[in-house]
C-alpha cells in the first residue's frame, strides 16, 4: 500500500480515480482518455501547489518517508566497486553505520553513512539507524584509513539520533561521539557530508564535522526532534508541527543560518519519487566540490573545516570590550 500523508491525500484520491478510469477503460473497452488526461492535469497542478508550499513539519514527514532512499541506495547509484568494511576492532560491528571504500568517477574515496532498514527485521538489525558507540568508532577507524591513504571522505547523515540505551551509555556513547568530533576536525583530507533524511543531534554530528555540509531539499538537521522539543517546551508532544516551525531546522532555514553550505534539489514530492534523479543531483554536487579540493593542500583543507565551525552562531566578544575599557 502506498504511503501518503494527510497533506497528500487529495493527490492520492485523484490517483485512485485515474486508476479506476484506466481499469474501466480496459475492462469495458471504453475510450476514457480525455477524462484521464484531465484528471492527470488536475493532479499535476495540485502537486505543484502542495509541494511548492510545504511547511516545516510536512518536510520532516517527507524526510521520514519509509520509501525514501537510504545511504546504501545512494552508494549503489553514485559509486562503483564499493567494498564494505566492518567492525571497530574494540567491541563489534554496528550495522547502523555503513562504511567502505569505493570509486567516484574512477577516483578512490571512503563512504560512510547511517543505514536504516526497510523491513521490521532489517530495522531491528540496523537499530533503526541509531548507532551505538561501536558504530562511531568504526566510522572513525575508517576515516583514519582515509587520512592515511589520502582519500576524500563522503558521509551520508540519516538518523533520528545516537542510540540512548543503557548498553550504549555503558560502552561510552558520549565519549565515542566526542572523540569523532575531535578527530574529524584534525583530518587532512576533504570531508563532505550530505543530510539525506533525518539529521538528529549528536548522532548526526558524529559523522558530520566536514568541510562542506549539504542538505537534501526535504531533509532536516536538528539538536532535538520536533516531538522532543514540543514535549519539553509545550509539555505536549502533539504540538510537534509548531515546534518544527519555530526550530528553523529545514534546509532553507539551515542555509540562512549558515549551518549548512548548500541545498541539493529533490524531485517534486521528495527523493522517493525518483531516487535516480536525486542521486544524479548529489553526484553533480560531489563532483564539483571534490574537483575543488584537488587543488588545495592538506593544511588548507583542515583550516577551511576549522574556520567553518568557528564562524557558526551569533556571539559577542565581551573580553575584548573589557580590555578596551581598562585601557
Curated annotation (Swiss-Prot):
InterPro entries: Acetyl_CoA_COase_a_su, ClpP/crotonase-like_dom_sf, COA_CT_C. Gene3D superfamilies: 2-enoyl-CoA Hydratase, Chain A, domain 1. GO terms for molecular function: acetyl-CoA carboxylase activity; ATP binding; carboxyl- or carbamoyltransferase activity. It comes from the Bacteria. One of its GO terms (cellular component) is acetyl-CoA carboxylase complex. Pathway: Lipid metabolism; malonyl-CoA biosynthesis; malonyl-CoA from acetyl-CoA: step 1/1. Its EC number is 2.1.3.15. The keyword Cytoplasm applies. Residues 38-292 form the CoA carboxyltransferase C-terminal domain. One of its GO terms (biological process) is malonyl-CoA biosynthetic process. It catalyses: N(6)-carboxybiotinyl-L-lysyl-[protein] + acetyl-CoA = N(6)-biotinyl-L-lysyl-[protein] + malonyl-CoA. It is found in: Cytoplasm. NCBIfam families: accA (TIGR00513), AccA_sub (NF041504), PRK05724.1 (NF004344). Component of the acetyl coenzyme A carboxylase (ACC) complex. First, biotin carboxylase catalyzes the carboxylation of biotin on its carrier protein (BCCP) and then the CO(2) group is transferred by the carboxyltransferase to acetyl-CoA to form malonyl-CoA. Belongs to the AccA family. This is Acetyl-coenzyme A carboxylase carboxyl transferase subunit alpha. It comes from Endomicrobium trichonymphae. The gene is accA.
